[in-house]
Amino acid sequence: MNSQFQARQIKQIWQRGVARRQFLKWGLGGVAAATAIAAGGFALLRRSPHDELPTPDWVTGLSAAEYHLFDRARVVLLPVEGTPLVDSEAVPVVANVQTTLSYLDPATRKELGAGLSLFDNVVVFSHGCRFVDLEDAQARALFDRWGEGSVLQRTLTTVIKQLVYSAYWQEPVTWPPTEFDGPVSEKWGLEYLGNAPMPQQPTIDVEQEQA
């Protein structure tokens, strides 16, 4: 699955799950709450050791906070220890996420960026630290809870999971342990035709129907 196709999928999930007006109401409200935390006595809680860590030189389409969020999500969502699966550390997961997000239109990318910031910061209320600083079990439990939460929570969880999973599995190095030998569309040289329209019912001429 190429990054452009995946970007279209992400945009559709985002737009279906969170209408623009709802996002402005919920998302910006949540960001405002997180900002209030930073301005108040809990400012120290929002700080993270990750804030002091440098990002790789190739990180140009993600903020530092987004890079650390997806790098943490990679570890949390792809626990392969004790399995024959390839360690996500050996796969350019976050780089692939960056590529996918680069195909989003500016408005959707901006909204999603605010949503990612909300996801990282809002757990300060319940855990006293950001998502990137949660223990693995806590972070997985957060994904489980948000997966059954509000529309905004479910949408953000779905988007993050799909970005991380697709970024991992699109790399051929991850396929051999599952005995997957690649998409048949590539092996057979099939051209991607985009989203085909649904078949239409044939129209019946009124005179023909009366006859």
Summary of predicted features, one role per range:
Residues 150-211:
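Long, amphipathic alpha-helical surface segments
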Residues 56-58, 63-170:
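Flexible, low-complexity segments enriched for small/polar residues
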Residues 1-18:
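N-terminal secretory signal peptides
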Residues 18-45, 135:
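N-terminal export leaders
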Residues 44-59:
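Ser/Thr/Pro/Gly-rich low-complexity linker/stalk segments immediately outside membranes or between
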Residues 6-7, 51-52, 121-123:
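Short hydrophobic/aromatic segments of transmembrane alpha-helices and their interfaces
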Residues 15, 19, 32, 61-65:
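Short, contiguous, pocket-lining structural segments
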